[in-house]
Structures are given as structure tokens and as C-alpha cells.
Amino acid sequence: MKNLSVFVAIFCLASLLGCRDGEDLPSTDFSITFKATYGGETLEKNKDYTFGNYPIFFEGCRMYISDIRLVNAEREVIISDVEYLDFTPENAVSATPSILFKNVPEGDYTSISIGYGVKPQLNARRPSNFPAGSPLSIEIDYWAGWKSYIFSVLDGKADPDNNGTKNLSFSYHCGSDAVYKVFEFNVPIKVKAGQFTTADIAFDMKEFLTNDDGSLYDMVANPATSNDAANVVVAQALTAHWGRATSITQ
């Protein structure tokens, strides 16, 4: 009788987990197009924008996101463990990468959850642990000294003196487990088997550089993140803005 009770408990747990990840449901392909913007306009490399009352341009904009989940009252479906997004590749002024997620269970999802950076379980590893082509095999965005991936990069120049010379270089390279942050966005996402489903996610760098009270981030006082692994104050402050800087539509 005791063995029967254990079997029933295991069966119920397995059934619950199956419902949670949606493996028992019809599925379809789901594509997300990602875009970096500035004030709602597609961000382009080396193009002048206005930051407050002075000009600014961007030289590099790329980021990791991980543990992407579709959520409703019945289940949470992990559609990706990690993705790498380069919005300013070497051979183009801008890019809007589209990623296809296969076999996504159908459902009326009420929110999407995104981890900004590389989640700790994966961040504990290093590029040599992954095969070529994996988002985590990229050496350029890994700090060996910190034992961490660089979660997001935003580089550029600005002219806070408005004298015609962009003499302020800014470099925001955010990383380490202490900086990783998850946001959940209450946006309806409908996925129906047999129908190709799409969504768009935009990351606005103007909002990323804006404080919660509406004031602009003090780029003159804090033009860069620290090289000291113990000092993540700037990185944490900026990463906290991703929730407001992200917009999702379907």
C-alpha cells in the first residue's frame, strides 16, 4: 500500500510538471524580432541623437537575455535558456535580429518573463564550455577576471559642453550575478497551433539612460561602469531601467 501511495504521488507530480511546461499541448513556431531604439526610433551606429540638450551617438549596443518564459495561470513555458543580441554589428549600422523558437505550446499567455543578462547557472560557466555557434561561446563578451559574461554593452560618445566636439566617451559594460535581473511584462501573447506566431520586443536606450524620476542618467559623473568586480553600483542602477526601457507587442 505504501508503494502504491508513492507511485501515485510520483505520477501526480509528473502530471503537474507536464502541465507546467506545456509538453502535452499542440505546439507551433514562434518568432520574436528584437530591436534597439532611441526615443522610439531604430538605433543606428554613429548617428547623432539628442540626450537632454546635447548630442550623443552610439558605437556599440549588444546584450544577453536569458530564461525567456511565456506565462499564464496554468503554466510557464521556457522558450529559450539564453540569447545574444547584437544591434550594431561590424558590417552594418544597425540590426534587428529575429529568433525562431520551435515547438512552443499553444495558449493564451498573459505575460512574458525575461532575464537581463546570463542567469547564474549559465554564468558560472565560460565560453570554452560551449560549442561554436552557441550564444555563450562568444569570447569578446566574457570577463575572465570576473568569471562572468558581459550582460550588456552600450558604448558611444557625447558632447555635454555643446562645443562641437564629442569629448566624453561612455562605456557601460554590465555583468556579474549581482547585476542579473528578471522582469515580467504583463502583455497578452496568443500562440495557436498551426498558425505562425510573431512578436516584437524593443529596447529603448533613451529609457535605459533615464532614471525612474524622469531625469537623465548623469553620464558626465558616471561615464563608465567600474573595472572592479566588487563595484557594480553603476551596472545595477542601469540594469534596473530595463523594465521601463522594454516594450513588447504582438
Could you say what each language-model-derived stretch is?
Residues S15-G18:
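C-terminal motif of bacterial Sec signal peptides marking the signal peptidase cleavage site
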Residues R20-Q250:
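A short, solvent-exposed, low-complexity linear motif enriched for acidic/polar residues
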